[in-house]
Amino acid sequence: TRFAIQILRDQIGQRVWPAHRLDRGTSGALLFALNSATANRLGQQFEKGSVDKRYWAIVRGFPADYGSIDHPLSRQRDDYEFQGKASSSEAQEALTRFCKLAEIELPLAVDRYPSSRYALLEVEPVTGRRHQIRRHLKHISHPIIGDATYGKGRHNRFFAEQLGCQRLLLACVELAFDHPVSGERLPIKAPVSGQFAAILARFGWPDTQ
C-alpha cells in the first residue's frame, strides 16, 4: 500500500490518503482519498462492514461449491499500528463466504497424491481481520497458491517453477461503497492481470467478474 501511495501521488501530483490496505502480494482494487477527512469517512465504512469486497483466489484442492467459514482469529498486530497502543491477542469473530467458480485436476503428483487439484474461488470477507482470507482458507485445508506464510510449499514451488507464477494468487476484484459526499453506491472493479490472468488462461478458466 505504501508503494501504491507513492506511485499515485507522483502520477497526480498531490498527496493521497489510503482508505484501506491490501496484504503484501495481494493485487486489485485500492481506494484512496484526496484529503484526510474523506479518507476517515471511507475508513469508517470499512470498519462498520458496509463496504462490499469481492476477491478471487486460486487454492489447492476442491472446496465445496459454496461455503461459509465462521472461525475466530487471534488479533495480529501489523507495522502500521502504534506500538504503544494496548491490544489483545484474544480471538475475534471472523466470517468469510466463498463460492467456487472453476476447478481443474492435473495428472501430476505435486504432493503425495497421483494428481493435483486446484480451484478458483470468489471470496467475500464479511469481517475484516488481518490476513483473514488467507488464514480462513488454510483453516479449511484449501490454502492459497503462492502464500509463503499460510500455503503449501510444494504447490507454491510447482506454480513458480513449472507455470512461471511466483505471486500470491489473491486479488481484490471489486469494492462497493457509499460515496462520502453524495451517498451514491459506487462499485469499482479491478480485473486480474499479469501472472494471475496467465494462470486463468492456461487452465481455461473465465477471467471476467
Model regions and ranges:
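Catalytic core of the metallo-beta-lactamase
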Residues: 122-124
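Loop/turn elements at beta-strand to alpha-helix junctions within RNA-recognition modules
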Residues: 36, 126-127
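Phosphate/ribose-recognition catalytic cores of enzymes acting on nucleotide-derived substrates
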Residues: 137-182
